[in-house]
């Protein structure tokens, strides 16, 4: 498996965060930075988390940002793609807990915070067949949005989820049916053809 990674940098309220990127991994875009804004807002509000899971990590930049902002005792990341798992491991360091698997099926226990920026585009909107079709999985909602949503509900006490007006998944029903309530909208941005926002959900006591 070839990996032609390069290094990028994201500026956050906690300082710069370096992350590895590979052409076969979803490149951080508007939805990523809106998720970063959400994490920054949680930090500004005084939230702290002892354990953080980045579910569908891609480059691992959101896990790295969470580590910078919250200084948790444990940060872990999961992605189906071997390219993404490798990039995330480079981003977080050789001793990091990074696993390649589908959703959270390889994990047990509960995490204080699960971060989820899921694939949400219709399958026909971005048919990328390069990289053994793995890049397409990072875009297309059909490939696993509901699987990831339910994994987040299984594993998290609180969930930060990125949402899009282009998505057809009923996220409210997905998380509500698993005992979660929406706490707040953390960031919200409108574009020409799309609105992207992030929400914080919390498991009922």
Tell me the role of every PLM-derived stretch:
Residues 2-69, 104-107, 184-186, 191-205:
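SAM-dependent Rossmann-like transferase core, predominantly class I methyltransferases
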Residues 27, 61, 82-83, 146, ...:
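Short alpha-helical
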Residues 69, 94, 130-134, 177-178:
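Glycine-rich, phosphate-binding/catalytic loops in enzymes
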Residues 27-30, 79, 130, 142-146, ...:
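Residues at secondary-structure transition points
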Residues 36-109, 113-127:
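Conserved SAM/SAH cofactor-binding pocket of Class I
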Residues 118-147:
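Mobile active-site "lid"/loop adjacent to the S-adenosyl-L-methionine
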């Amino acid at each position: 498996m070839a990996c032609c990674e390069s290094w990028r940098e994201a500026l956050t309220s906690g300082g710069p965060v370096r992350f590895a990127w590979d052409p076969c991994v979803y490149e951080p875009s508007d939805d990523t930075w809106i998720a970063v804004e959400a994490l920054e807002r949680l930090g500004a509000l005084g939230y702290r988390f002892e354990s953080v899971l980045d579910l569908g990590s891609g480059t691992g930049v959101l896990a790295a940002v969470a580590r910078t902002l919250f200084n948790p005792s444990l940060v872990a990341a999961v992605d189906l793609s071997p390219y993404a798992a490798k990039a995330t491991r480079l981003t977080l360091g050789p001793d990091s807990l990074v696993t390649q698997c589908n959703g959270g099926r390889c994990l047990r226990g509960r995490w204080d915070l699960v971060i989820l920026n899921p694939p949400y585009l219709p399958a026909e909107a971005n048919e990328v067949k390069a990289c053994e079709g793995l890049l397409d999985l990072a875009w297309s909602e059909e490939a696993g949005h509901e699987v990831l949503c339910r994994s987040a509900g299984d594993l998290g006490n609180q969930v930060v989820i990125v949402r899009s007006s282009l998505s057809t998944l009923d996220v409210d029903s997905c998380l509500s049916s698993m005992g979660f309530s929406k706490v707040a909208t953390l960031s919200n941005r409108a574009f020409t053809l799309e609105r992207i926002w992030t929400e914080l959900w919390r498991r009922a006591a």
